[in-house]
Design a protein with these regions (language model features):
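Short, glycine/acidic-enriched loop or turn micro-motifs at the edges of active sites
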Residues: 99, 160, 181
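Generic long, charged, amphipathic alpha-helical segments
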Residues: 140-173
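Short, proline-centered helix/strand-breaking motifs
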Residues: 34, 163, 177-179
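Single conserved hydrophobic/aromatic residue that forms the stacking wall/gate
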Residues: 174-185
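Conserved thiamine diphosphate
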Residues: 1-128, 137, 153
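Internal active-site segments that recognize and position negatively charged phosphoryl groups
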Residues: 131-132
Length: 185
């Protein structure tokens, strides 16, 4: 279908996607075909049992040439990523999301999707938390706990898992902590 000019969207559980590794590599990515992989149940899925955990897709998808991998922070970003993948992109792309109803938090942060670029959620000075997908929920909770202790926390939505936004590595320059015997500088 993709070789014929269509834009197929393949919706699949993460645990079943691994069975198609060879086809993804040879029939889609090496040929640089525009296929969108909508990967449901990505990550740990406790109630689905040990054989249906979506824990391997990151390792094998990021090793495939020409594959882009994204993870939305919430339902709105999932919709924006699908639109980006279908209308503004022309290569293999995977969008991975967890099981269950889409998270509706962080709605106030909706920077336009630019290829390979992370989204700055909150920029402060002490500690930087960089997370992708539903791990932003955890990052937000950690930020609240650390804020109570007086820390200023940056949160970055690393919406592209591959390619990684290397500009975000510059965050380490302003968030470096040099331990000393009695304090941190």
């Amino acid at each position: 279908m993709a070789a014929g000019g269509l834009k197929p969207v393949f919706a699949v559980y993460s645990s079943f996607l691994q069975r198609a590794y060879d086809q993804i590599l040879h029939d889609v990515c090496i040929q640089h075909l525009h296929v969108v992989f909508a990967i449901d149940r990505a990550g740990l899925v406790g109630s689905d049992g040990e054989t249906h955990q979506g824990i391997f897709d990151l390792s094998f998808l990021t090793s495939i040439p020409n594959m882009t991998v994204m993870a939305p922070k919430n339902g709105s970003e999932l919709s924006a990523m699908l639109e980006f993948a279908l209308l503004n992109f022309n290569s293999p792309i995977a969008i991975r999301y967890p099981r269950g109803q889409a998270y509706d938090g962080l709605e106030e942060y909706n920077a336009p999707i630019r290829y390979g670029k992370a989204e700055m959620i909150i920029e402060e000075s002490d500690i930087a938390l960089v997370a992708a997908g539903n791990m932003l929920i955890t990052a937000q909770a950690v930020r609240e706990k650390l804020k109570e202790k007086g820390y200023n926390i940056t949160i970055v939505n690393e919406r592209f898992i591959k390619p990684v936004d290397t500009d975000m590595l510059d965050l380490s320059l302003i968030h470096i902590s040099e331990p000393t015997r009695h304090a941190q500088i």
